[in-house]
Amino acid sequence: MTMRPLHATSVLTLVLALASSLAPVGAAGAAQEKDEPGTVHINAVKDPEMRTYRAIAAGLDTFDAQHALAPDVPQLRFQVEGRDGEALKGERPLARIAADDFSIPLSLDEQASFSVPRSQAAWDAKAELILNRKKYDVRVETWVRTPGLADNQYRIGDIRLDCRVKVAIGKAEMPFWAVGLVNGLLLTTDWCSWFKGETPKGGDRSWSRRANAKLSTATLRDGERSLALRVSGKSFRIPIGDTSWSNDALIEVTYAPAEDAAAPATLPAVTRTAGETPRTAP
């Protein structure tokens, strides 16, 4: 049997996914804490969702360094979602930055998003971001979005910055060999620049962005120029590495119509035979 070659896009997606699950369960998740004001008690949760503070700090550094991509976004935020990207159910989770000897509670808003403060103490202690949800139930995503956009609009500069932040966090949590593997496959250390869209040989090197609901269409617009984007379910694919599109270019999506309500049950057909009373068809 002939094996298909492993596509670079698949490898990058796989490695970033693995990186999100590589954060070690350290002492911060197992230590018992004193009952002090402001303490967030989440130690009873077995195998909680965790991410290293140093990886988050790498994302904060990249956000600051690349802020020109999305200058109107005031700060990097993080969003807690269901494992498959769906909205959370039930109560909002509790979160903290914690190490053996301290804990910094984090405040989540109604959309379960939050910001992470810079803390030299957290860096020095190799602290972790910990949620009181099991890691297989939720995930933490970066959130970069210019205020004032319509619900069906996305700005490509925001998506470019979000990609760079995600990659910075992923690299910080990957082993050295994995970073080198992806660098070699993409032939660049700037992974986000690799996603330039369709290739001359018919391939697709596009970055996938998830919307809020199932999509019907997605169109990239920049002045008089436009491009129909591929959609699949709730996601659309965007050539963020194609610099011919300005950072202010917008993606406008149309959502798929809601599924039709279930049709009423159909009554069985009635047939007649000569000299017989009506009977239902078989």
Where are the predicted features?
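Bacterial N-terminal signal peptides
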Residues: 10-23
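Noncatalytic modules at the cell exterior or secretory-pathway interfaces
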Residues: 114-135, 241-252
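A eukaryote-biased signal for long
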Residues: 167-282
